[in-house]
Amino acid sequence: MKILVTGFDPFGGAHINPATEAIKLLPQQINGAEIITIQIPTVFRKSIDVLFRAIKKESPDMVICIGQAGGRYDITVERVAINVDDARIEDNEGNLPIDSPIFEDGAPAYFSDLPIKAMVQAMQAANIPASISNTAGTFVCNHLMYAALHYASQYQPDMKVGFIHIPYLVEQVVGKANTPSMNIQDIVRGLTVAIHAAIENKRDIKVQGGAIC
């Protein structure tokens, strides 16, 4: 089995992105699967081009994209991606799409086909704060997740796809009172456990993991 794991470059004036830092430290094999990592530009459309080239080159069985969700205190496994770009800030090339479909011919939304609840449960069992998220936002993270799921639906239906958001690193919140963060070691451990669970569980488990709002 081959798993492609992506991480974004820094954006929004930051000098670091925990997604890229974390994937650099992932083991080359997890649960018998080969782990291939690539950095993705935080740029609308270009991010998709880079991802699609990597998928065509590597032919992975699974794609897991990693992104930063500043303000979240835990590692969150995304449930769904929606077909809209609605940027609050510019991407790294100054693009600021508003209410634009990602793919004109795409479905309104795609659900991750990873075992998201099993992944969360495995991280929690390893004492890593984790939960399911029901929104990947409307910036480049959602853009990339949606594109990967759209690609799979059109060209590679056996390829599993999902997205994981991670908190700020500790060094990113210096001087930012009451801003949650997580150290890089726990992030890497959480991602490793989550990927292991994604490989292990061909179907998701039936446990509570929803939200009231």
Curated annotation (Swiss-Prot):
Gene Ontology MF terms in the entry: pyroglutamyl-peptidase activity
InterPro entries: Peptidase_C15 (IPR000816), Peptidase_C15-like (IPR016125), Peptidase_C15-like_sf (IPR036440), PGP-I_bact-type (IPR029762), PGPEP1_Cys_AS (IPR033694), PGPEP1_Glu_AS (IPR033693)
Catalytic activity entry: Release of an N-terminal pyroglutamyl group from a polypeptide, the second amino acid generally not being Pro
Keywords: Cytoplasm, Hydrolase, Protease, Thiol protease
Subcellular compartments: Cytoplasm
GO biological process: proteolysis
Class of this enzyme: hydrolase
Residues at the active site: 78, 141, 165
Transmembrane segments: none
Entry's EC annotation: 3.4.19.3
GO cellular component: cytosol
Domain of life: Bacteria
Pfam families in the cross-refs: Peptidase_C15
Gene3D superfamilies for this protein: Peptidase C15, pyroglutamyl peptidase I-like (3.40.630.20)
Family: Belongs to the peptidase C15 family.
Main function: Removes 5-oxoproline from various penultimate amino acid residues except L-proline.
Subunit and partners: Homotetramer.
PANTHER family: PROTEASE FAMILY C15 PYROGLUTAMYL-PEPTIDASE I-RELATED, PYROGLUTAMYL-PEPTIDASE I
Protein's name in the database: Pyrrolidone-carboxylate peptidase
Organism encoding this protein: Alkaliphilus oremlandii (strain OhILAs)
